[in-house]
Amino acid sequence: FAELLFPDVTKTPEYYEEKYPYRKLPNKAEVTRLAPSPTGFIHLGNLYSALTDERLAHRNGGKFYLRIEDTDAKRTVEGAVDTVINVLRYFNIEFDEGAGYPDDDERNAYGPYYQTQRVDIYHVYAKSLVERGLAYPCFCTEEELEEVRKQQEEAKELTGYYGKYATCRNLSDEEIEANIKAGKPYVLRLRSQGSPDKEIVFVDEIKGEVKLPENIHDIVLLKKDGIPTYHFAHAIDDHLMRTTVVVRGGEWLASAPIHYELFHVLGFKMPKYAHTAHLMKFDEETGGKRKLSKRKDPELSLDYYRKDGYHPYTMKVYLMTLLNSNFEEWHEKFPDKDINEFPFSLDKMSTSGALFDKDKLHNICKNELSKLSEDELYDFLYDWAEENEPEKKNIWFADKEKMLGILRLYMGIGMKRRRKDFMYAKQIFEMIGYFFDMEDTQEKDEFRMDTEDVKTILNEYLSMYNHEDDNSEWFNKLKAIADKHGYASDMKAYKANPEAFKGNVSDIAEVIRIAVTGKANTPDLWSIVHVMGEAQMRDKIQKVLA
């Protein structure tokens, strides 16, 4: 009855084996893939997996491709594929082939890469299984299946369609033909060869040797509309696209017996599997670890990092520390080497769950951004502002030399040691916003002196200010203001007898600093004023005095 089920299928598995030959790749090269559902939501776990796949493939000249598992129409979101490609491209992860390339492009050689466009292929292999007695149509209704499930639960038996519960498994050819001609809807099921008292054994590339019970379920291969289930499509796609390593989350380990059986009944060589541990975070409420959650953790979404402007390289450095336990030591030893030179290995990946630590991410951001030149950081900030703050961009980047001067100042370029204040674009613009008169939209630090003392100091500062003064001359004038109002100009004298003074010259500088920047802590104040310009500085102080 294979012809009855698939009257329009004329091709054979051999046709596709010839159409998609084994790839000619260097020794030890791997073929990996990212295979998301087009839901429109791409998260940190996807980036974590994509980086794993990309590093595995490219360490020895292999291929990394994008496949879209879009068989669930209810979850498909328009534009989701472009989102996946563009978000990963932002993080400098590019696919060698796959979804997103034109049909006639050589990077589409093993396509199509959308599962909904591969239904004819799945039907060829489904027909072959039917011909060999390894698959059969099941006419059970949802109500009948639900009744079986209830019986199994009451009897405290394994739930599912197997053994004596697989009633359609034993239908005669005549019964099958009569049901089909009567127009009864059906799914196509695998006739499982598994035994409940046997195990499968395979070596997981991360977890090591794994033993699991054989699959005994007659799983659905094709749904009533002819669309394949994930399990069936996965096996055929990974075989024909010549995937050598499947990297996926640990939650898929329980499905390994199903995939193991499918690869064997289809006559395919099974790829290597690497089941990654979940990304975890410390839960302050419970004091323990938990999985990152879409509902609880906004930082799970990659849009979070794009919109706030995390530099893609800093994210990759951080994720590499989670992926391989020996990466940090290597990166400290070779700080100027491209991280793609790191000898990435699956056996250095965590088996218990990598702990996502935002503080550590920010420390890495500070360290990596401090290595950039002011021009590199300028270009990154410009691109981020163009996409995320187009109106403010025209203000921030109206004067390129001014912006470069600000970046040099905050990065400590020209100093003995680079400053490490910057973490991500949004935070950077908040930090330097006062240069563009944006401090009114930000929270300001409070003056620690009373209002009259603040006004007195600011008025005297303006009256004696000369923009031609060098740093030393400028600071001597601050000392003079300090002496006049009972503040120590000599720090040694202040430390020796602090009770003799109202404070010291740094308190005078703080008043001016807060008036000019809105912040008590900034880089060198004299340098700030000279990047800003005298007119803007005076205007800011006059606003405070008013």
Predicted segments, located by residue:
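Active-site cores that bind ATP or allylic diphosphates and position pyrophosphate for catalysis
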Residues: 128, 136-275, 280-292, 301, ...
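Short amphipathic alpha-helical segments and their helix-coil junctions
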Residues: 29-33, 65, 298-299, 338-346, ...
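Residue-level signal for inorganic ion chemistry
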Residues: 53, 84, 129, 133, ...
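Catalytic adenosine-cofactor/nucleotide-binding cores of aminoacyl-tRNA synthetases and other
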Residues: 266-448, 517-546
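Charged substrate- and nucleic-acid-binding regions of tRNA-handling and nucleotidyl-transfer enzymes
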Residues: 479, 483-546
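A generic secondary-structure signal for well-formed alpha-helical elements
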Residues: 88-95, 130-137, 149, 156, ...
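N-terminal Rossmann-like or analogous alpha/beta NTP/dinucleotide-binding catalytic cores
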Residues: 1-154, 254-268, 314
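Glycine- and acidic
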Residues: 32-39, 65-70, 240-246, 299-301, ...
